Amino acid sequence: MKLCKGAILALAVSYGLTYCHTTKSKLTLEQKSDSLTVIHITNPTNYILLPIEEEAAESQVLLDTGEAADTDMDIRLAQTQVDYFVPFALPAGAKAATVRVRNKSKDALCWKEIKLSDTFDTANTEKFRPVYHHTPLYGWMNDANGLVYKDGEYHLYFQYNPYGSKWGNMHWTFCQ
């Protein structure tokens, strides 16, 4: 009986290791033309971290889910240097994800620097970033709209570009 339990345990561990190995995230680039690259991701992490160059021309980045609501985001992907990274959320629990990037050349630095991650460090390490006044964890904000008191809490609403430090990709969000 001990032999059977040992064999079953060995099989279970072997299966577990195989399962962990086969669910590893993988990113592959398919450069369809000089201005269109498709990023295929198997077993996506929470984010794809996009390398940003402040002075680069904007590229159009689209998480392609096949839904009518899919929208291009204008993002300054790194051409020759990486100034910082921004997280681009991937679908939770999906087996695969597709990201289409238009208007970024095949030789751009971003293709070597792009990475997958389940986390994004938002520690305040910037010398001039305020501690007392509200700022988003990353990105650009504008048009703070006063405090709104609702359900016993104050909310501050503002416009937000999560993909860079310049105007664009307007999202509305709030903090409590």
Stretches found by the model and what they are:
Residues 1-26:
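Bacterial Sec-dependent N-terminal signal peptides
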